[in-house]
Amino acid sequence: MGVKVGVLALQGDVAEHIAAFREALAERPGSSVAPIRRAEDLADLDALAIPGGESTTISRLMGKNGLYEPVAEFEGGVFATCAGMVLSADRVDDPRVRPLSLIPMHVARNAFGRQVDSRETMLEVAGLAEPFRAVFIRAPVATEAGDGVEVLARIPEGIVAVRHGRHMAFAFHPELGGDLRLHRVFLEGLEV
């Protein structure tokens, strides 16, 4: 049976997420990936990707477009990257961001500082046999993970990958670089 994935398409690296999920789902007949711009677009989805971008902008646009409550109440799995990790938390260090409270964790925005402080690193991620090339772009970190949150990866600055039930959140951008292992782990987790 196919998997239906939506990508929140308000701001950020939407096209990259759509392309990565399409490739990850290529061998699953009947699967689809679509941009999500309205609450009614969430119907019948198995999963939702909340992309990187600017978390305060995405938060504001979610409210403006009537998406905050529908996304916060979404029952499928959520794949959140960078700004998506910020939004998926239940506590954020910036009052301009209205967190969705999907994952019990505290997230600090822009923990890496300015754009010039962005970097790539080979990261050990729990469940992956080989290190993952992680692209951090003005990335957040989780400073605390709550009950039931599995920490998948951390760096000296903090926690950078977590799983909570069917949700996964990353401070980095797994949709960049062509390594789809984390997408596949996420998709396999939807079948639980």
Swiss-Prot record:
| Source organism, top-level taxon | Archaea
Where's the active site on this chain?
C82, H173, E175
The UniProt keyword set, sorted, is: Glutamine amidotransferase, Hydrolase, Lyase, Pyridoxal phosphate
Q: Which SUPFAM superfamilies match?
A: Class I glutamine amidotransferase-like
UniProt pathway annotation = Cofactor biosynthesis; pyridoxal 5'-phosphate biosynthesis
| Enzyme Commission code(s) on record | 4.3.3.6, 3.5.1.2
What family does this belong to? Belongs to the glutaminase PdxT/SNO family.
| Subunit note | In the presence of PdxS, forms a dodecamer of heterodimers. Only shows activity in the heterodimer.
- What role is this protein assigned? Catalyzes the hydrolysis of glutamine to glutamate and ammonia as part of the biosynthesis of pyridoxal 5'-phosphate. The resulting ammonia molecule is channeled to the active site of PdxS.
Could you identify this protein by its name? Pyridoxal 5'-phosphate synthase subunit PdxT
